[in-house]
Amino acid sequence: MRVYLHHLVWETDKEGFKKRINEYLTIADKHHISTIFVFLDDCWNPVYQAGKQPEPQPGVHNSGWARDPGDLYYKGDTAVILPVLESYVKDILITFKDDKRIVLWDLYNEPGGSGGYRYGERSLPLLQKIFTWGRTVNPSQPLSAGVWDMSLTNLNKFQLENSDVITYHTYEGVNSHQQLIDTLKQYGRPMICTEYMARTQNSTFQDIMPMLKRENIGAINWGLVAGKTNTIFAWDTPLPDVVEPPLWFHDIFRSDGTPYSTEEVECIRSLTK
């Protein structure tokens, strides 16, 4: 399971936040689920606040998702936010640095930004800093930051040269996905695809999972249960007047626990035995 954290929740209640992380890990481990935690994120809403969050917008993909640090860093006073981020990252890493329930730290999700205003290469200094913080703590688990946009040359170079495990995102079909794998193989490190599976993009379990298994690449799709994130709806394709789209974009299970597609679940089971 890949789980996103946020510095504002830590800042609001440090000990409570770490307690809840541990409670989640206990539940996940009971069900034989290992975890990748994500720290920073350049996707979706750049402004946020603590407390009750906005209600999801009907039919809109990820309407409530918050970047971290977002505008606090890119439009604010970096001298104020950087020490907070450093303390946050180091505190979590030190607390869980030898926790075997965590398989990897994903330091920065999609640096450069997607889902609205993009920071582009401006994200490189912060990316470099979080790797420095991570190496200072030196946790037992590997550190990584997934490549996701091949046009972000400087970011990609740093990510690939500094990640213990090569992680990447792609929602393309089999041929494009295979080309990306062939490119990333040259680094000679273990690989995990930490985001894939968008049905309307021809990135499906039935097509992609056999390829990843053949290539000995770990696979984490986006989305488990349809819920407040509304990721059954596609990016930039709001459908506010329908309960669900004709073809789900992400996610595996309905809110009642039944699978969206029995065929998909059988495919996943057969490939993970």
Sequence positions of predicted segments:
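Conserved catalytic-core segment of NTP-binding enzymes
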Residues: 180
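Active-site mouth of glycoside hydrolases
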Residues: 1-163, 169-176, 187, 196, ...
